């Protein structure tokens, strides 16, 4: 016998139908339990009353009519019914049904016999106490009207005299026989109900299996076989419905959208420029000021340019308004000459070549002072003279140098545009418009080492701000709104205040690099 908690042997294919139906429905299980218990109680009563009646009489006819055998069969049937409720095996249920059917017939016969004998005892009213060899026996017979004794022709009943009054013993036997008759009738009814229920259960399971093979098991929530028992049924994967998938996850975007920027009143209409091809965005919409994607690494962009780059002189623009004449800022104008050019650098650059020394340091030549441009010359003439002046040499920049310049042509191309803007401001007379300087100031050129520290190269914030300000100055129109001019002026003032610190940091880094 397998253990209570261990696995059990699977059942045959014909068994699960009746078992699962009985196990799945607690109502039918309770009915089977009630019928089994009732049969056990009735069987015990029939056996007890039958033996009591046998003890009161010695007559063979009465003794043979006491249905104690029916009581034993009913008791056994009730016991099988309780077992079928505890262990709902198809074999046990079938045996319970057959035994209940047998009990119906036995109880029916016992009830008939007990009732006949009870009527016989009630008809024998004349009882006498007779002694046979020191043995007392009560003899009951049918009374005759013309005689007071019992005739030998009629029926006689011999009773065991438990007391001197034989009539009391006869009445007790009569009551016991009628009680046995009533108990047999009740047992017949109970056994018939048990037989009908078991038969209907098995037939219904067979019919469901025949007409509905895929729905033979009850779909009621109260009729479910617990997992791990012998009645556990295999899941039907054809009726399995997969759960709904979770909603897709979209990561948050921490960028400024054009819709949000449109509420600020910042409407810029810039012309197309190489800056859009460099950062793969368009610069004619407010959203491009805050690109959703980060710009490409500086090393990747510089890697597309040739190894040796041309050094150029930064163009210095003096911007002053009528309201604040003391405010001045120097900005470079990074207009690339080709698609592979880089933004121009701020500050001073060296025009002489750098020659490495034998010990690994760099030897810087004597800085050259550019020829100042006279004030009476126009910007176009100044640009032509700057182009005609021969360059003493070129500076070999590092690949990772963010201050690399393209050529002097990129600087000279922005001067006619600034002159045109100045001419329009002077003609309109707007006090809030910007004015360009009368000329470029001579600037002392500082020597820069061949290689820059990586800490300066990785400083993307300053480089990006410088490029953004340069693009504002490059594409600035004379008819910009007041708000835009205020924003540009603020950025220029901040960049101007930070220019000396940046130059000192670059110079210090160059000295440390030489050491």
From Swiss-Prot:
It is found in: Membrane. Pfam families: CD20. Keywords: Membrane, Transmembrane, Transmembrane helix. Residues 335-352, 400-416, 423-448 have a biased composition (Polar residues). InterPro entries: CD20-like (IPR007237), ENTREP1-3 (IPR030431). The keyword Isomerase does not apply. Residues 357-366, 379-392 have a biased composition (Low complexity). GO terms for cellular component: membrane. PANTHER family: PROTEIN ENTREP2, PROTEIN FAM189A. This is Protein ENTREP2. It comes from Mus musculus (Mouse). The gene is Entrep2.
